[in-house]
Amino acid sequence: MLGLKGCLTILIGYVIAVCALFSSRGRNPSLTDWEKLKDQKISNIDNFGLTGQHLLAFFQENLPFLSFSEEKYRHKHVSLYYDVFKEYILRRASSKKCLPVDSAIAKLNKDVNPMPVHSHNDYWRKLPLFEGLAYGASSTEADVWNIDEKILAVGHNEAYLDPVELTLDKLYTGPLLEILDEVNCQDSDSDRKNGVFFNSPETSLFFYIDFKSDDNELTYKLLMEQYFKSLIDSGYLTYYDMKKDEIIWRPVTVILTGNYPTSLDILDNGNDNGYFESSQRFAFLDAPLLSLEPKYSKLSVAATVSFSQLMKHCGSDHWKVSLRGRMDSNEISCAKSIIDGAHALKLKTRIWGAPTWPANLVETISRQIIHDLGSDLLNLDNLFMASSLI
């Protein structure tokens, strides 16, 4: 018969085996598990030590735990996921303590290199602005609608706007100001400003504002005098210096697209020396890639065209490319010459509307756009796929 020592050995071995079984299956903790741990105040931890895609995955997998029994999350603003994530990221941004190494940017994208990707329809993501920054996307986008001549709501369709929670200031300009203040606290008066990428603070985030409303002059006025004013006053927006005839790069570069005003009289508020009479222009036009003129070297920093327009210009058709599964040598040669022309004017380029299905076609065309054509910003909805293609 086995002695007491032998029985204990067998029992311990059994417990270890059971624990290993559950561990190997990757069982997610239940709400009961979280209930036992709620007193540890996990939702008050300032830094989990995760960044980029790992941070996003952690929040998605542990959302019940992170928000459990927190009264402040009972009323959602955007979504439970967004509200909890934003609160974590910006938790210390309002603090008077100046410590950029432990900032929102450090939590979002430390050890994540910026990638030449445009976060297309960024406002549709579960985490507008934050998800793109976590992946390192160096360009983002917001469609804006003028509501009651005083609010810029963000959304793709006018029928589904929320002028209270889903606004330009709550989703984009407000968080950007907090984030940038946090990493520029050590010398806020310096002309040198740190940007939104931890690994590359000198990289400017392209911020496309897509005008949707008919009254684009009023929309532009709201942008300049209300939504971007604090960013301008803090020195965070790239601008064209009218006196020096050069572009001065800053952490955020605003690009107007869609139904935007093109008149310099509107862009400069009727002044010869800029909107605020400071000899600075704080917004750039999304230049038409197929009809560029020398003037765009001062008015723009980027030029755009749709994939279908580009293929038509090159004597082809986007359906032919899709059926073939790739661009042929003639199409590549033609498109590359167009992009080279933009580069001669020191403009970045973006091609939107490329095939979105199937996945192998998307990957092939995307690689050709970046590597064969030499386009600067890969326009994709799927940031995970984009990160694997760059």
Curated annotation (Swiss-Prot):
**InterPro entries under this entry?**
AIM6_PI-PLC-like_dom, HAT_RTT109-like, PLC-like_Pdiesterase_TIM-brl
- Cite a single GO BP annotation: lipid metabolic process
What span is annotated as the signal peptide, if there is one? 1-26
Is this entry keyworded Transcription regulation? no
The Swiss-Prot or TrEMBL record annotates one GO molecular function as: phosphoric diester hydrolase activity
UniProt keywords, alphabetically: Signal
Q: Is Signal a UniProt keyword of this protein? A: yes
Which PANTHER family does UniProt cross-reference here? ALTERED INHERITANCE OF MITOCHONDRIA PROTEIN 6
Family named by the database record: Belongs to the AIM6 family.
Q: What is this protein called?
A: Altered inheritance of mitochondria protein 6
Q: Which organism is it from?
A: Saccharomyces cerevisiae (strain RM11-1a)
Gene name linked to the record = AIM6
